[in-house]
């Protein structure tokens, strides 16, 4: 794979993983800390997309979203990155853009670095979300990259509390 293919594949995986996490969280609306992390993944991705597209962001970096708003933003972010990268020429990954962060500081960063950051940042927070799910006896989402590539879930260690509860039923 060339660099553009890696970026596109990483962002496609992110969209897929966000869908998997949404499904796991939808069944656990009481996990407010996990929802806060999930909404941040979406909010940060939208903020970065807005910077890349040189427009104001429609949400904050740490938005407070309803279930419906989170689902709509998840879809908008996935579609937005697909659209953005489909129009991007391979050489544009090294183009540098200027933007202002949420603290008001100005930075200059290559488009490829921003796109890679979006994918990696999401993975970091998805791991935290899965840990929060597991700590609350909820089934984590199998959102590993290899599961995305294979099209089947990676091996998942059962949540002991769930395993015992099902055995008692």
Outline where the language-model segments fall.
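Helix-adjacent hinge/juxtasegments
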Residues: 57-100
């Amino acid at each position: 794979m060339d660099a553009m293919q890696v970026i596109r594949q990483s962002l496609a995986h992110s969209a897929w993983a966000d869908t998997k996490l949404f499904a796991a969280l939808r069944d656990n609306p009481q996990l407010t800390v996990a929802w806060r992390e999930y909404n941040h993944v979406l909010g940060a991705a939208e903020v970065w997309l807005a910077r890349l597209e040189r427009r104001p962001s429609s949400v904050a970096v740490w938005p407070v979203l309803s279930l419906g708003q989170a689902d709509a933003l998840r879809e908008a972010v996935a579609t937005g990155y697909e659209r953005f990268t489909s129009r991007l020429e391979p050489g544009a990954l090294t183009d540098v853009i200027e933007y202002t962060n949420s603290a008001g500081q100005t930075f200059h960063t290559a488009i490829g670095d921003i796109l890679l950051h979006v994918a990696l940042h999401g993975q970091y927070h998805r791991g935290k979300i899965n840990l929060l799910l597991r700590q609350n006896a909820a089934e984590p989402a199998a959102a590993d990259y290899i599961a995305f590539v294979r099209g089947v879930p990676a091996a998942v260690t059962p949540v002991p509390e769930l395993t015992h509860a099902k055995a008692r039923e």
